[in-house]
Amino acid sequence: MDMKRRDFLKMTAALAAAGVSPSLLTAGKEQFTVYGAPAMPSVTIAVTALQGKLAKQADVSLKIWRSPDQLRAGVASGQFKVMMSPSNVGVNLRNQGQKVGMVNILTNGITQLVCKGSAIASPQDLVGKKILVPFKNDMPDIVLQALLKKLKIDAHKVSITYAATPPEAVGLFPSKGYHAVILPEPMATASLLKGKTIGINVVHGFDLVKAWGQAF
């Protein structure tokens, strides 16, 4: 989906506002909280909460979880009743005995490789590079590790540094000696825009979805 910078900033601002507001609608209805991921699909949830049929029946609020660990804890405690989740987390929670079910796959292909200077054109070109990745042992780290293994690329030859969250990765990427960062939207676009504002050439690398499809 093509998006102008102004539209992106509006959507990001709306998502941020939804994450901190106690409610997206007026009070007086049944409280209904959806816990969204720190990624572009939560914008869809925010719009749906405002304009969808559910909004007529419940006081819908959207809160954003910061990490998969927070998501797991929220489900285990019973606090999270309706939430967005990486597909692997949902499956693992179910296998662990949690009473959760997946309604649908909301989106795919939103995880991007963003590079500093020149684009990294293929997975093989990651060798010798310093890569910044959020959420160790979760998406997108699982995707990267599986891709390297499938293509028989020695993971020890790729220098991987982990950030706690995508926003933290966006902040670290320009000022450190990283060649690339793996980010979900809208954080990938935020990284590109930040590069422009501070005079650093930040570009898209190879298509992770295409590389995955070719490998598997």
Name every feature range the model reports, one short phrase each.
Residues 7-26:
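N-terminal export signals
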Residues 29-41, 58-63, 128-132, 161:
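Short, well-ordered beta-strand elements
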Residues 32-36, 98-105, 129-132, 199-203:
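A structural signal for short loop-to-beta-strand junctions that line the ligand-binding cleft
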Residues 38-65, 69-70, 74-76, 92-96, ...:
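Short, polar/charged alpha-helical segment
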Residues 63-73, 86, 158-172, 186:
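Short helix-initiation/N-cap motifs at beta->coil->alpha
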Residues 76-85, 98-99, 129-130, 174-183, ...:
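Alpha-to-beta junction loops
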Residues 88-89, 168-216:
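Pocket-lining segment of extracytoplasmic ligand-binding domains
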Residues 116-131:
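Flexible hinge/capping segments at coil-to-helix
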